Amino acid sequence: MSYISRVEGRVVGRLVQLIESTRGQEEQGRGGEGHHRMGITRRAEDFPLMISQYGLSSALTFFLSKVGRDDSGLLDYGVDYFKGPVVNLDQERWKELASDAGEEGKGYVSYLALVLVWPLGEAMAGAGLNGVVNGLKLSGSDHVRGAAGLLLRNLQGIQERELLLEVAAMPGLLELKKITRALGR
């Protein structure tokens, strides 16, 4: 098993866990009636399409603009959650992340945390943007937004690098779209 497949397996396992935890709140929120799609499912549908229409930098900038300063700590927590073993699961943060993933108009924080680990995080490492990937591992406030900003600065003016990242990440992004659709039903 390769490193990427282990990362992918862990991330997808964490995604399943997150989506499963939203099932109860989803049923309560809609009273069992009507059609409701989880926020993370909508974001998983939107992001690849935005990349193909506007490019990775524009799509990432738009998604980051939807993450408020108050949510940056939650984004940090989400990246840590998807990255590896969470020894001491912060129940409040977990509830916030699950709420973000489950609410129809939200999902930006949980989806960005997910893709910054895999597949975009892996594509960045493969493209030699290890400084950005390592920035995601730092502790401290707002480090994820800072690392994403670093990614955007690295992409400016280097269209070939952006296209390489798009091509490398797109298969994984499309898989996440399928997985969230299947789990969100």
Locate the predicted segments by residue.
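Small/polar/charged residue-enriched interaction surfaces, especially the RNA/DNA-contacting tracks
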Residues: 1-185
